[in-house]
């Protein structure tokens, strides 16, 4: 029966492996069925239940210890295998058999003690073999002679003492890189490189750095051609260095790298004699790196390098520099991370590329004379330019690439006269002055790339980009605009495909700011101060694919619909904004949910307000913005009722006043027998006939007349209601042609109708003073209807007619009136039903 400890030793690795391949979670797998990263899972053997389709397998840091034959037969498609630090001590014959597609094998950090002659058999496609720190003592016993496809062999940090290249190297015809750095090689003899004489490897790059070199036999490298030779930290004294470099005589190398590594210097001193032996080499490109010595008279140091095409100094301290003059035939000069006493004087007729970056000292730029220069990189030097830029500054009219980024103050005093061939221009993180005073780039009609990011530029001039008709990429992040408003400054940039306006403190933009940018594909508006998403300015961007509005303060979209986004848009970034998750913005929040395929990292879009929803993902938001139907119905009905009441009160204000008066005076005494309504045109008849006969007759009747009985200073309407109707038993309406045409008379008549309706004892007596045309009478529908249906008195100016008229009128007025011969007037409001004649 299996012991508990043994069972645990089996189950723990198995469980670890299953955690790697379970379908629910492919971690730590990178690409299911293709790439598996199973580091540090405590495997003691090669897992056999990975899919056959596996192409990339990382088993590093597992205690495999032993690789037997056909260890990887389950992975016939394997292309990359990493076995770093797996404590492998033994590799048997055919361990990698069946891996015919394997191109990369990494064995770093394995203490190999037994390596069978057929250990690497079957690797018919292997191109890269890394055997760093594998206790390898000699290349002679390394069984790789059959790996004809091998391009890169790295055996650094081993115990190799001899540089002798075995005869099998003649089979490695595709070998391009051999790394023997950090071994124990001290001497190189002619016989060590015999195989390279017999079978030249013209593309071979050889790294011998960090070997304690003491001797190179003269002629050892004679007539040998290499692509690259690196010798860094190889020599412990200047004399040894001189001797070894002289031993390289006859070598033809495309690129030679000499020097030391940072903080690992062995040399105590360095002078011009160290490189004298280079005169016997044929070199195309030369690099000297990390010599932390104060070199004086550096030009004499490179007398043997006047004809190299490329010259490079990296991390070299130079006390004094004479002219880099026309004697040098360099086409490419690179000075990186060096220390200068002053900016060097450059006068190089054939130089096409100058890289002068990250240097210290000599902060003031001085003019150079480089008539063939096409590429100039002066970045990261802290340089200041009193005037920039024109042909006289650089001594060339052929310049196509100019990088002045990460420098000091650059004062723009010229619009690049003589530099019309420029295609690439970079000013980022320098301090530009006078940028908005004139059209700085007016001459640069061939410019394709422009970067003025973080240059303290304040755009106050709409013609700042005039002339840039060929520009495709514009980066201007970290600058500012007048009033934080983006104006129409891109009108000439019709070929622009990339525009970066991030971190510009923008709050608003012109609706036509981008109208001319029909070719624009990428627009970055992030890190600004927009509070709403305005889609209208983008309607003309028919080629736009990427729009970044992240890290603004966007709460919602503007009121217009969101259809103005171009149909070409594929990626919209609205992350890290201040979304307001309220009912007021429900349509915008719903739009976000509908456009989740368009939005970048939509799951990171979170609510900022209100406080109870802060931090909540917009996608998971579920706002109920519909009110209860009953509440809505009651609210609407209440509004309608209030509105109708208000309209009725306004329209029937005087009728309501009459109603209030009837309630107030309904049971009081009447002062008048009748209130007379008539036209002022009929006032003579009223005075001479009506008043005289009724008030002076027997019995006498008291009439209410406006010219006599209305109270001065009171509104006419109030007098009509309070003095006329409320204090009278009856109403006499004198109908005439003038009456019908008078608005006041009609108003009084309408109030009289309401009064008659409200008071059961009230009565209206109509007197038709003269014949009225029916067409005129029909204009007053209610009056016409009443006269048609009710009895009325008609005035006739004859003896008989008068007699009948006054008798009938007195009879009508006596109805409801208490009268005694002594002339005492009784109550008139006895609430008996009135008789209307």
Curated annotation (Swiss-Prot):
> A GO term (biological process) for this protein?
positive regulation of NLRP3 inflammasome complex assembly
As for PTM, the annotation reads: Phosphorylated on tyrosine residues by LYN after binding lipopolysaccharide.
CC terms in the record's Gene Ontology section:
early endosome; lipopolysaccharide receptor complex; plasma membrane; ruffle
Q: How does it sit in the membrane?
A: Single-pass type I membrane protein
Question: Does Transmembrane appear among the keywords?
Answer: yes
Please name the Gene3D superfamilies in this protein's record.
Ribonuclease Inhibitor, Toll/interleukin-1 receptor homology (TIR) domain
InterPro entries found in the cross-reference section: Cys-rich_flank_reg_C, Leu-rich_rpt, Leu-rich_rpt_4, Leu-rich_rpt_typical-subtyp, LRR_dom_sf, TIR_dom, Toll-like_receptor, Toll_tir_struct_dom_sf
**What UniProt keywords apply to this chain's record, in alphabetical order?**
Cell membrane, Cell projection, Disulfide bond, Endosome, Glycoprotein, Immunity, Inflammatory response, Innate immunity, Leucine-rich repeat, Membrane, NAD, Receptor, Repeat, Signal, Transmembrane, Transmembrane helix, Ubl conjugation
Q: What subcellular locations does the record give?
A: Cell membrane; Early endosome; Cell projection, Ruffle
Query: Which family is this sequence assigned to?
Result: Belongs to the Toll-like receptor family.
The job of this chain, per UniProt, is described as:
Transmembrane receptor that functions as a pattern recognition receptor recognizing pathogen- and damage-associated molecular patterns (PAMPs and DAMPs) to induce innate immune responses via downstream signaling pathways. At the plasma membrane, cooperates with LY96 to mediate the innate immune response to bacterial lipopolysaccharide (LPS). Also involved in LPS-independent inflammatory responses triggered by free fatty acids, such as palmitate, and Ni(2+). Mechanistically, acts via MYD88, TIRAP and TRAF6, leading to NF-kappa-B activation, cytokine secretion and the inflammatory response.
Q: What is this protein called?
A: Toll-like receptor 4
What organism is the protein native to? Gorilla gorilla gorilla
Give the gene symbol.
TLR4
